[in-house]
Amino acid sequence: MARRYFGTDGIRGKVGEGPITPEFVLRLGYAAGKVLAGADRWAKSGTRPTVLIGKDTRVSGYMLEAALESGFSAAGVDVMLAGPMPTPGIAYLTRALRLAAGVVISASHNPYYDNGIKFFSADGNKLPDEVESQIEEQLDLPLACAASEQLGKARRLDDAAGRYIEFCKSTFPAAFDLHGLKLVVDCAHGAAYDVAPHVFHELGAEVIPIGVAPNGFNINDGVGATAPDALVRAVRANHADLGIALDGDADRLQVVDAAGRLYNGDELLYILVKDRVATDGKVDGAVGTLMTNMAVEVALQEAGVKFVRAAVGDRYVLEQLREHGWQLGAEGSGHILSLDRHSTGDGIVSALLVLAAMKRSEKTLADLLDGVTLFPQKLINVRMKPDADWKSSDAIRRAIAKAESALNGRGRVLIRASGTEPVLRVMVEAENAADALQYAESIAGAVKEATA
């Protein structure tokens, strides 16, 4: 049965519109609390479960945090409040503190007027689809407040930032440090505004922080991983060695070198896999997505590394990594998974892995990527009505068939609906940029007409 509320990355939407309203989020906290409290671990022990709630810097986070806290309390679940904290920080702390679950209030790279809720299980992984379905089923049942003596309590986790900073530093090889490096760190006015600069500074780098003045409304606004031009300018202006850009909840990464060249998740995956081959002698395989550039797939296969494409979404990359028993996977957008370091994508940890690869090899990013030239891709996002039936459109099918025929196996066409917003993503990959642009615009035009 299709889920009504949960998408590929939790529940997300515009604040004040369903489902991101205080009433719904209170019910969501209650429903999640009932599902968690009913789990065997807690039912058999007779103890009360505790969940950890973190958030990014959106002004709506205060309202939604209070609603979630009320819902969990009504279900008889205790709450710990971490305040602003990167999504991967909540995943780590949930596991380290042996809590029942972690909850993040964030809409990641979206504007401030959007927000969302995502859950992590006790082991720091995103909830399986079946557990999210159980929560949706519980949402249909009446809210019955626990008796007064069974209500959950709430308290602050005062040392959340320090714990997470130390965890991030622990993933960097003890044999190396960052002394002598000048880094620009762009925190997108988001959840990592405090912790990220400390991590790199404490490892020895000279840190120039930008995007570290959140006001509730400026998250991802012209800064961060989804707006890397600000980072490029700062790297050049400060003659920095490297620039690191995180998004609003710090689970994705973009990197800029001293020349102002931007490296996306596909390229960083290749660099990390090759570094692992150099240190371990062998990497069995890596996971990308349907959007991963074909040049990376070819280069990895030439290096003897198997490559598998997952559906778009880091949860699906994670599923494929587990299925194959592999460690490294990524999305082009900058979600990078290294399962021997963390259970989920972590922008700060991923940046440290990239820096370690540079230190180990004594090479620049450009040198580490030598011989890999990405195929030009053109991605066009077409907004449409949430219920638009684009799959049955003959016009869209004809446009796709025409493009695929013209590319004749020397490129790819991918059309997919976003899992987080009412957008159809049209991606064309070709041997030259002009063809990619031409066919992407042709298909996007057909989509606009068919879904108007």
Curated annotation (Swiss-Prot):
Q: Do you know which PROSITE patterns this protein is assigned to?
A: PGM_PMM (PS00710)
**Which GO biological-process labels does this protein carry?**
carbohydrate metabolic process; peptidoglycan biosynthetic process; UDP-N-acetylglucosamine biosynthetic process
Q: Which Pfam families match?
A: PGM_PMM_I, PGM_PMM_II, PGM_PMM_III, PGM_PMM_IV
Give the residues annotated as coiled coil. none
Q: How is the cofactor bound?
A: Binds 1 Mg(2+) ion per subunit.
For this chain, the family text in UniProt reads: Belongs to the phosphohexose mutase family.
What is the name of the protein in this document?
Phosphoglucosamine mutase
Organism encoding this protein: Paraburkholderia phytofirmans (strain DSM 17436 / LMG 22146 / PsJN) (Burkholderia phytofirmans)
